[in-house]
Amino acid sequence: MQGKVALEEHFAIPETLQDSAGFVPGDYWKELQHRLLDIQDTRLKLMDAHGIETMILSLNAPAVQAIPDRRKAIEIARRANDVLAEECAKRPDRFLAFAALPLQDPDAATEELQRCVNDLGFVGALVNGFSQEGDGQTPLYYDLPQYRPFWGEVEKLDVPFYLHPRNPLPQDSRIYDGHPWLLGPTWAFAQETAVHALRLMASGLFDEHPRLNIILGHMGEGLPYMMWRIDHRNAWVKLPPRYPAKRRFMDYFNENFHITTSGNFRTQTLIDAILEIGADRILFSTDWPFENIDHASDWFNATSIAEADRVKIGRTNARRLFKLDGA
């Protein structure tokens, strides 16, 4: 399929590059560094070869979210966004941008999002999970009350917010002790991000801000296949504390969330996602450079779904969500 839009596609700046070192074998690190720092060469050639018209680029993980010093987090976020704006300006026909945000400081994050959207032309934000602040030992999740004004501005700006994974903090990772192969994208990423998303749903955030659009990668971090059970079991909870939100989890998932195919190239999983959340809320992505563009594109081009759904997932859903056709 030609003309695809891909939107979980990462880059790095020198200050954040090392954050990605632990996710690949040592002998692949040199190649990954090249892939993360390159935007205008290898990346574009692969896009051309595999029918990707547009990439929406975002900073690698955890980057800004793992900088406990507020001032430093603000500085790195701003620098990354400025670098990305310069790169996108070289090929505005091919590249768009997600803002990195220093959510250690909700006010600063709000100001940076405003700057990126209003002044730099960014189409949304991608944030790498919870933020660390102060001593770095307490994860800040975005259902907390101090983030409500930030979410109000996201809704006002009418741009999507991509909640990208990161590993849990060491003190919250004891279940993985002795089992490091379960950390990262194998399992811990999905578990951490799914719980964060469920906290957002349960908090009443989407009752207050019903026009928010949240994106989850990796075919929804496992959530599409659990929503019925989550609601079914919560229906049995008759005693307080009940979760604060007014509606079922499934209602928020179906109305406020979108999912991407990033790093999860399995036809059966895609078909199940279509049945659960609908083809209108699924978006093609590759997860470059941690996955290969050819693997993602070759699978998607041939996967056994209706051609109308392929066009939606591969192109038109993203163009509508990000208003790329002036909508």
UniProtKB/Swiss-Prot annotation:
Optimum pH is 8.0 for decarboxylation. Optimum pH is 7.0 for carboxylation. GO terms for molecular function: carboxy-lyase activity; hydrolase activity; metal ion binding. Inhibited by CuCl(2), monoiodoacetate and diethylpyrocarbonate. Inhibited by 2,3-dihydroxybenzaldehyde, which is an analog of the substrate 2,3-dihydroxybenzoate. Its EC number is 4.1.1.103. The keyword Zinc applies. Induction: Induced in the presence of gamma-resorcylate. One of its GO terms (cellular component) is cytosol. Optimum temperature is 70 degrees Celsius. Pathway: Aromatic compound metabolism. It catalyses: 2,6-dihydroxybenzoate + H(+) = resorcinol + CO2; 2,3-dihydroxybenzoate + H(+) = catechol + CO2. Binds 1 Zn(2+) ion per subunit. GO terms for biological process: secondary metabolic process. Involved in the gamma-resorcylate (2,6-dihydroxybenzoate) catabolism. Catalyzes the reversible decarboxylation of gamma-resorcylate to resorcinol. The reaction is reversible, but equilibrium greatly favors the decarboxylation reaction. Also catalyzes the decarboxylation of 2,3-dihydroxybenzoate to catechol, but does not act on 2,4-dihydroxybenzoate, 2,5-dihydroxybenzoate, 3,4-dihydroxybenzoate, 3,5-dihydroxybenzoate, 2-hydroxybenzoate, or 3-hydroxybenzoate. Only resorcinol is carboxylated by the reverse reaction. Homotetramer. Dimer of dimers. PANTHER family: 2-AMINO-3-CARBOXYLMUCONATE-6-SEMIALDEHYDE DECARBOXYLASE, AMIDOHYDROLASE FAMILY PROTEIN (AFU_ORTHOLOGUE AFUA_7G05840). This is Gamma-resorcylate decarboxylase. It comes from Rhizobium sp. (strain MTP-10005). The gene is graF.
